[in-house]
Amino acid sequence: MSSNNNFDNNKNNNNNNNSNQNNNNIDNGGNNNETNPTTWKFKAQTPTDFNITVRKRRNSEPGVLVQRSYKNYVTHWKLETKKPTKYKDAKEERLRQQAQQQQQAQQQAQQQQQQAQQQQQQQQQQQQQQQQQQQAQQQAQQQQNQHQQNQHQQNQHQQHQQNQNQNQNQNQNQNQNQNQNQNQNQNQNQNQNQNQNQSQNQHLHQLNQHHPIQHQHHSNNHSNNHSNNHPNQQQNHQQNHQQNQYSQQNYQQQNQGQNNYNNNSFQGNSNNNYNNGYNNNSNNSNNNNNNNNNNNNNNNNNNNNNNNNNNKNSISPTSSPLLFPSPSSAFTSIKSTPPKSISGSSSPFQDQARSPSSSFFHDRDLPFSRGGAQRKPSIGDEFKFHPYSLNNKVTNLIDNCNNSNNNNNNNCTESNDDDSPLNGGLGYSRLSQRRISLPILANRPPSPERSLSPIHERNSLNIINGFNKNNNNNNNNNNNNNNSNNNNNNNGNNNPLPHINFENRRPSREEPIVIINNNNDNNYNKIPSQHMHDKKSSPTPRSILKQTISKYHGNECEEEEEYNTNSNYYGDNDNRNISNQNLVASNASQSSGSKLPSIQSLLNDVSISDNKSKSNSNSPTIIGMNNNFVGGANENISKLSSITMNHHSNFNNLVDDNSHISNNNYNNHHNNNNNNNNNTNNNNHNNNINNNNNNNNNSNNNSNNNNNNSNNNNNNNNNSSNNNNNNNNNNNNNSNNNNNNNNDNNNRSPRNMLFYLNK
């Protein structure tokens, strides 16, 4: 009790109103819906001993947590029902008002509907009344008409009777007159009677002659009517038939004119579309001089129009002419209809020309596609790949050799050509259809199963072969093959434009870059068919994904390959012919001193020849999923001691700027990039050769078309060892403009990642 007295003294001294309020609440257990505190563990003797703290619950359940304490002793927490809100009545009134308003609105709507129905009924009644009135009027008019007709008939009958009476009276009068005349004639002399008899006989004879003349006249009229009607009808029928024939001829002529106009306009539009899409290939489609240095003025005009009128093609990023097809891979989801040939001409481009109403950007989205009827590629085809199946898309690459309509069979690469891997090329023959590409690491988890999947494995060489997959008459100026420009083979042959389906698509972010070694030695006499799938799981992050590739070379132990996704390396893929250099990262060279392998060691476990001394000169060539990685021609990847490297200008313009360009302004920005390339081409060729659709060979003609320079690659070796990409060709200062602007470290984020393989 002493403690209670102390508490009461404190309350009296401090005038604690809160305790009084709590008092009232507890005394009046029914007030404000509070529960009676008789069920608590600690029962107070006086109700003023309690302090109440109220907390809201976290969830939206009803009630609050109430903490009641006796002095400083916390009894327990208890869930009590939530007190009614002060504005509950107001809310109820609002709800009532809203309900009343809704009811009133419903009633008004019902009343309006009823009124509308009543109005409709009234209108229907009025219409019925009007119809009844009209029917009554019609009946009255009919009655009047009948009455008038009856009166008219009666009048006619009366007139007819009157006429008959008059005729009878006249007949009676005539009879009387005749009787009088007869009496007078009888009173004449007998001599006169004789004369009358003679005159009567003559009169009868004249009557007999007069009636046959009338009959003949009637028959003549009838025959004239028949003879006049039927020939006229026949003539009219013939004239009508001739008019119908004339109208049919006019219709046929109009149809022929329209068909000719449609055909001409169709071909014209398709050619214009082709010129817009394919730039330098259109006007020389029937010649073998597509890749001459001095292009025709028509060709240049088309290219100028393409660069100056890109708004025609810049409808949307997806409908632009293959400059920016999709951020995803073009091998999976692009659907296109096969082209239909317009005419039977020998032009290879009309096989791929399409109507203006259809989409202009058709099969060039797919690097595998060719001209001619072909079924639509589906996503399932990606998983049906087999390297030796006849249904493979690689067989399309060989069709040029077997095509009877192919006028230039120099594209048919055999194993003894300059392109074959036996002779040091990149391998465009049938032996090198087994191919490999490194994995796509962008936007993927670092699982080692994705490293060397066969789905992506077939993409790199298809793109390489796509460069050889040219049309019929559009192949080479000379008799050499497309990619025969090796390190020692700059014999003045111009590298032609790549295939239309192949060059105009920009690479997506997910497409890998494969490092391939160009080896000019005839060391690779055998490509075994063993498939490589040795996998090695590693907990390393995605930036450095280590995997093992089993080497086919003897008893060498397995070594790791390092995928450096943070690198800034960009390479050139112009002639597939970059001179011999080693691109070795500094950490890789310091740690293991390893060397980059050749492409033959990666392609299906290809055995490396015994001449290991030449493996040091194996130059890496960066081959992406698209030929648009092509930079300045014959520009070398320099030896670097760090993981930074200067951009090549064309690679910058064609690839890297896509990550900085919005979709809407893509074409305009891309035209500016192409104009940078065109300055070099204008200086080289004195022509306005413009690249609308990333024609990489136009930017590569800076060094490819230098027919007078036979030491291009040697100069590249000297310059690339000094980290100078300026002097690409000693005799071609104009082509160096592509690289002068790129010695700065423009370290933009690359679209695709280089994968460095440590041999």
UniProtKB/Swiss-Prot annotation:
Domain of life: Eukaryota
Low complexity bias (residue ranges): 1-36, 142-211, 221-347, 463-495, 660-747
Paired cysteines (S-S): none
Segments for region (Disordered): 1-47, 142-380, 409-428, 463-504, 654-759
Amino acid composition bias (Polar residues), ranges on this chain: 348-360
Annotated protein name in UniProt: Putative uncharacterized protein DDB_G0279653
Native organism: Dictyostelium discoideum (Social amoeba)
